[in-house]
Regions:
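Non-catalytic accessory regions of SAM-dependent methyltransferases
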Residues: 1-40, 46-48, 52-53
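Conserved hydrophobic residues forming the short capping helix/wall of the S-adenosyl-L-methionine
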Residues: 20, 114, 162, 239, ...
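Residue-level signal for inorganic ion chemistry
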Residues: 35, 73, 103, 132, ...
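Conserved AdoMet
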Residues: 36-112
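Conserved SAM/SAH cofactor-binding pocket of Class I
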Residues: 101-208
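Helix-to-beta-strand junctions that scaffold the AdoMet/dcAdoMet cofactor pocket
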Residues: 167, 217, 243-245
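Mobile active-site "lid"/loop adjacent to the S-adenosyl-L-methionine
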Residues: 200-231
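Conserved Class I SAM-dependent methyltransferase catalytic core
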Residues: 226-288
Length: 291
Protein backbone atom coordinates (compact mmCIF):
# COMPACT_ATOMS: atom_id res chain seq x y z
CA UNK A 1 0.00 0.00 0.00
CA UNK A 2 1.45 3.39 -0.96
CA UNK A 3 2.37 5.73 1.87
CA UNK A 4 -0.15 8.49 2.52
CA UNK A 5 1.55 11.82 2.00
CA UNK A 6 1.58 14.02 5.07
CA UNK A 7 1.02 17.75 5.20
CA UNK A 8 3.91 20.02 4.25
CA UNK A 9 5.20 23.00 6.19
CA UNK A 10 3.73 25.33 3.57
CA UNK A 11 0.33 23.64 3.66
CA UNK A 12 0.22 23.72 7.45
CA UNK A 13 1.18 27.38 7.49
CA UNK A 14 -1.57 28.25 5.01
CA UNK A 15 -4.13 26.31 7.03
CA UNK A 16 -3.13 28.02 10.27
CA UNK A 17 -3.32 31.46 8.66
CA UNK A 18 -6.75 30.71 7.22
CA UNK A 19 -8.22 29.52 10.52
CA UNK A 20 -6.73 32.37 12.54
CA UNK A 21 -7.79 34.98 10.02
CA UNK A 22 -11.28 33.49 9.84
CA UNK A 23 -11.57 33.76 13.61
CA UNK A 24 -10.63 37.44 13.49
CA UNK A 25 -7.27 37.04 15.21
CA UNK A 26 -5.09 40.11 14.71
CA UNK A 27 -1.78 39.53 12.90
CA UNK A 28 -2.92 36.08 11.79
CA UNK A 29 0.20 35.51 9.68
CA UNK A 30 2.56 36.24 12.58
CA UNK A 31 0.52 34.02 14.89
CA UNK A 32 0.57 31.20 12.34
CA UNK A 33 4.33 31.41 11.87
CA UNK A 34 5.01 31.35 15.60
CA UNK A 35 2.63 28.48 16.29
CA UNK A 36 4.12 26.41 13.48
CA UNK A 37 7.62 27.31 14.56
CA UNK A 38 6.98 26.12 18.11
CA UNK A 39 5.27 22.93 16.95
CA UNK A 40 8.01 21.98 14.48
CA UNK A 41 10.96 23.59 16.29
CA UNK A 42 11.69 25.90 13.35
CA UNK A 43 12.60 29.57 13.35
CA UNK A 44 10.96 31.93 10.87
CA UNK A 45 13.66 31.64 8.22
CA UNK A 46 13.65 27.84 8.47
CA UNK A 47 9.90 27.79 7.89
CA UNK A 48 10.22 29.66 4.61
CA UNK A 49 13.26 27.67 3.51
CA UNK A 50 11.45 24.37 4.08
CA UNK A 51 7.95 24.97 2.73
CA UNK A 52 7.95 21.64 0.85
CA UNK A 53 9.21 19.63 3.81
CA UNK A 54 6.73 17.16 5.22
CA UNK A 55 5.75 17.68 8.85
CA UNK A 56 5.96 14.75 11.22
CA UNK A 57 2.56 13.59 12.46
CA UNK A 58 3.33 14.62 16.04
CA UNK A 59 4.35 18.10 14.84
CA UNK A 60 1.07 18.54 12.98
CA UNK A 61 -0.85 17.40 16.08
CA UNK A 62 1.07 19.83 18.27
CA UNK A 63 0.33 22.68 15.87
CA UNK A 64 -3.37 21.83 16.03
CA UNK A 65 -3.34 21.87 19.85
CA UNK A 66 -1.57 25.23 19.92
CA UNK A 67 -4.01 26.60 17.36
CA UNK A 68 -6.98 25.58 19.51
CA UNK A 69 -5.51 27.43 22.48
CA UNK A 70 -5.08 30.58 20.41
CA UNK A 71 -8.58 30.36 18.95
CA UNK A 72 -9.99 30.20 22.50
CA UNK A 73 -8.33 33.55 23.17
CA UNK A 74 -5.18 32.56 25.03
CA UNK A 75 -2.47 35.18 24.37
CA UNK A 76 0.19 34.12 21.89
CA UNK A 77 2.90 35.07 24.40
CA UNK A 78 1.61 32.53 26.92
CA UNK A 79 1.36 29.85 24.23
CA UNK A 80 4.93 30.51 23.14
CA UNK A 81 6.10 30.98 26.73
CA UNK A 82 8.23 33.94 25.68
CA UNK A 83 8.01 37.58 24.69
CA UNK A 84 10.32 40.53 24.07
CA UNK A 85 10.56 43.78 26.02
CA UNK A 86 13.03 46.60 25.47
CA UNK A 87 14.95 44.38 23.06
CA UNK A 88 15.39 41.59 25.61
CA UNK A 89 13.83 38.09 25.81
CA UNK A 90 11.55 37.12 28.70
CA UNK A 91 9.75 34.00 29.80
CA UNK A 92 6.07 34.61 30.58
CA UNK A 93 3.18 32.53 31.84
CA UNK A 94 -0.22 33.16 33.41
CA UNK A 95 1.35 34.15 36.73
CA UNK A 96 2.54 37.46 35.26
CA UNK A 97 1.24 40.31 33.15
CA UNK A 98 2.57 40.29 29.59
CA UNK A 99 4.99 43.25 29.24
CA UNK A 100 3.54 45.97 27.01
CA UNK A 101 5.34 48.25 24.53
CA UNK A 102 4.03 51.35 26.34
CA UNK A 103 5.88 50.31 29.49
CA UNK A 104 9.11 50.67 27.52
CA UNK A 105 8.44 54.43 27.69
CA UNK A 106 8.66 54.18 31.49
CA UNK A 107 12.04 52.46 31.16
CA UNK A 108 13.25 55.15 28.75
CA UNK A 109 12.17 57.91 31.13
CA UNK A 110 13.94 56.16 34.01
CA UNK A 111 17.18 55.86 32.05
CA UNK A 112 16.92 59.50 31.01
CA UNK A 113 16.74 60.58 34.67
CA UNK A 114 19.58 58.25 35.69
CA UNK A 115 22.05 59.46 33.07
CA UNK A 116 24.36 61.03 35.67
CA UNK A 117 23.96 58.29 38.28
CA UNK A 118 26.02 55.23 37.38
CA UNK A 119 25.18 53.20 40.49
CA UNK A 120 21.63 54.02 41.60
CA UNK A 121 19.59 52.02 44.09
CA UNK A 122 16.22 51.24 42.49
CA UNK A 123 13.00 49.70 43.81
CA UNK A 124 10.61 48.03 41.37
CA UNK A 125 7.22 47.59 43.06
CA UNK A 126 5.06 44.84 41.55
CA UNK A 127 7.84 43.53 39.36
CA UNK A 128 5.83 40.66 37.81
CA UNK A 129 7.98 39.17 35.04
CA UNK A 130 10.81 41.47 36.08
CA UNK A 131 10.50 43.37 32.80
CA UNK A 132 11.30 46.85 34.15
CA UNK A 133 14.02 45.84 36.60
CA UNK A 134 15.77 43.54 34.12
CA UNK A 135 15.65 46.12 31.31
CA UNK A 136 17.06 48.84 33.58
CA UNK A 137 19.73 46.52 34.96
CA UNK A 138 20.86 45.61 31.45
CA UNK A 139 21.48 49.31 30.76
CA UNK A 140 22.80 50.23 34.23
CA UNK A 141 25.28 47.47 35.09
CA UNK A 142 26.40 49.18 38.32
CA UNK A 143 22.85 49.71 39.61
CA UNK A 144 21.41 47.82 42.58
CA UNK A 145 17.79 46.66 42.51
CA UNK A 146 15.07 45.42 44.82
CA UNK A 147 12.31 43.76 42.78
CA UNK A 148 9.22 43.38 44.94
CA UNK A 149 6.03 41.40 44.35
CA UNK A 150 3.38 39.64 46.40
CA UNK A 151 3.46 36.59 44.12
CA UNK A 152 6.23 34.11 44.82
CA UNK A 153 5.51 32.38 41.51
CA UNK A 154 5.97 35.67 39.66
CA UNK A 155 9.24 36.33 41.49
CA UNK A 156 10.61 32.92 40.51
CA UNK A 157 9.87 33.72 36.88
CA UNK A 158 11.40 37.20 37.25
CA UNK A 159 14.55 35.66 38.73
CA UNK A 160 14.70 33.28 35.77
CA UNK A 161 14.43 36.25 33.41
CA UNK A 162 17.22 38.06 35.24
CA UNK A 163 19.48 35.03 34.81
CA UNK A 164 18.59 34.70 31.13
CA UNK A 165 19.61 38.33 30.59
CA UNK A 166 22.76 38.13 32.74
CA UNK A 167 21.67 40.63 35.41
CA UNK A 168 20.84 38.24 38.28
CA UNK A 169 23.63 39.55 40.51
CA UNK A 170 22.20 43.07 40.38
CA UNK A 171 18.68 42.22 41.54
CA UNK A 172 17.38 41.08 44.92
CA UNK A 173 13.88 39.61 44.75
CA UNK A 174 11.60 40.22 47.72
CA UNK A 175 8.12 38.79 48.33
CA UNK A 176 5.57 40.72 50.37
CA UNK A 177 2.57 43.01 50.36
CA UNK A 178 2.77 46.74 49.61
CA UNK A 179 -0.23 47.28 51.88
CA UNK A 180 1.23 45.55 54.95
CA UNK A 181 2.97 47.46 57.73
CA UNK A 182 6.22 45.52 57.30
CA UNK A 183 6.59 46.52 53.63
CA UNK A 184 9.22 49.21 54.23
CA UNK A 185 11.19 46.95 56.56
CA UNK A 186 11.26 44.23 53.89
CA UNK A 187 12.63 46.40 51.07
CA UNK A 188 14.78 49.00 52.85
CA UNK A 189 15.13 52.74 52.32
CA UNK A 190 17.19 55.44 50.59
CA UNK A 191 16.25 54.57 47.02
CA UNK A 192 17.36 56.79 44.17
CA UNK A 193 14.33 55.70 42.18
CA UNK A 194 11.05 53.85 42.60
CA UNK A 195 9.37 52.43 39.51
CA UNK A 196 5.96 50.82 39.48
CA UNK A 197 3.49 49.44 36.96
CA UNK A 198 0.50 48.95 39.28
CA UNK A 199 -2.96 47.49 38.67
CA UNK A 200 -4.64 50.62 37.32
CA UNK A 201 -7.75 49.31 35.55
CA UNK A 202 -10.95 50.17 37.41
CA UNK A 203 -13.10 47.21 38.46
CA UNK A 204 -15.99 48.51 36.37
CA UNK A 205 -13.82 48.45 33.23
CA UNK A 206 -12.77 44.80 33.46
CA UNK A 207 -15.78 43.43 31.59
CA UNK A 208 -14.93 45.56 28.58
CA UNK A 209 -11.41 44.17 28.17
CA UNK A 210 -10.47 41.73 25.41
CA UNK A 211 -10.96 38.06 26.24
CA UNK A 212 -7.25 37.35 26.03
CA UNK A 213 -6.62 39.95 28.72
CA UNK A 214 -9.49 39.54 31.18
CA UNK A 215 -9.69 35.73 30.99
CA UNK A 216 -5.98 34.90 30.98
CA UNK A 217 -3.77 37.58 32.53
CA UNK A 218 -3.61 37.71 36.35
CA UNK A 219 -6.53 39.76 37.63
CA UNK A 220 -4.55 41.21 40.54
CA UNK A 221 -2.04 42.65 38.08
CA UNK A 222 -4.80 44.32 36.06
CA UNK A 223 -7.21 45.85 38.56
CA UNK A 224 -7.11 47.03 42.15
CA UNK A 225 -10.74 45.98 42.53
CA UNK A 226 -11.82 49.59 42.93
CA UNK A 227 -11.25 52.80 40.97
CA UNK A 228 -7.79 52.11 39.54
CA UNK A 229 -6.12 54.58 41.92
CA UNK A 230 -5.70 52.52 45.10
CA UNK A 231 -1.99 51.91 44.52
CA UNK A 232 -1.34 55.60 43.91
CA UNK A 233 -2.87 56.46 47.29
CA UNK A 234 -0.68 53.85 48.96
CA UNK A 235 2.44 55.00 47.11
CA UNK A 236 2.20 58.54 48.47
CA UNK A 237 2.21 57.03 51.97
CA UNK A 238 5.44 55.10 51.43
CA UNK A 239 7.43 57.19 48.92
CA UNK A 240 8.61 59.72 51.56
CA UNK A 241 9.86 56.85 53.73
CA UNK A 242 11.57 54.96 50.91
CA UNK A 243 13.12 57.64 48.73
CA UNK A 244 16.22 59.67 49.46
CA UNK A 245 16.01 63.46 48.89
CA UNK A 246 16.36 64.05 45.17
CA UNK A 247 15.13 60.55 44.35
CA UNK A 248 12.45 59.85 41.77
CA UNK A 249 9.19 57.94 41.61
CA UNK A 250 7.80 56.94 38.20
CA UNK A 251 4.48 55.11 37.84
CA UNK A 252 2.47 53.87 34.87
CA UNK A 253 -1.22 54.76 34.83
CA UNK A 254 -4.36 54.54 32.73
CA UNK A 255 -4.70 57.33 30.20
CA UNK A 256 -8.26 57.92 31.41
CA UNK A 257 -7.03 58.64 34.94
CA UNK A 258 -3.75 60.35 34.22
CA UNK A 259 -4.84 63.68 35.67
CA UNK A 260 -6.25 62.01 38.79
CA UNK A 261 -3.07 59.99 39.32
CA UNK A 262 -1.03 63.16 38.88
CA UNK A 263 -3.09 65.02 41.48
CA UNK A 264 -2.52 62.21 43.99
CA UNK A 265 1.24 62.00 43.37
CA UNK A 266 1.66 65.76 43.63
CA UNK A 267 0.70 65.54 47.30
CA UNK A 268 4.23 64.28 47.99
CA UNK A 269 5.91 65.09 44.67
CA UNK A 270 4.86 68.72 44.01
CA UNK A 271 6.73 68.90 40.73
CA UNK A 272 5.31 65.64 39.35
CA UNK A 273 4.39 65.58 35.68
CA UNK A 274 2.50 63.45 33.18
CA UNK A 275 4.34 61.82 30.29
CA UNK A 276 2.72 60.39 27.17
CA UNK A 277 3.39 57.07 25.46
CA UNK A 278 4.24 56.77 21.77
CA UNK A 279 0.56 57.06 20.89
CA UNK A 280 0.36 60.42 22.65
CA UNK A 281 -1.69 59.13 25.60
CA UNK A 282 -0.86 60.31 29.16
CA UNK A 283 0.35 57.01 30.60
CA UNK A 284 3.09 57.86 33.10
CA UNK A 285 3.29 60.09 36.13
CA UNK A 286 6.52 60.86 37.92
CA UNK A 287 8.36 63.36 40.01
CA UNK A 288 11.31 64.06 42.27
CA UNK A 289 11.08 63.76 46.04
CA UNK A 290 12.32 66.74 48.05
CA UNK A 291 12.06 66.88 51.83
Amino acid sequence: MPKVKGITVGEELAMLKEKLSGAGVDSAAVNAEQILGKAANLDRSEIFLNMEMELAANEARKAEKLLKRRLKGEPLQYIMGTTEFFGLPYHVDESVLIPRPETECLVEWSLELLTKNDSPKILDIGTGSGAIAVALAAHKPEAEFIAFDKSLKALKLAAENSRMNDVREQIQFVVGDLFKEDFIFSVGKNFDMIVCNPPYIAEGEMADLQTEIKDYEPRDALTDGADGLVFFRRLIEVVPKLTKPGGWCLVETAAERGSEALAIMRKVLPGAELRCDLAGRPRMVGGQFKR
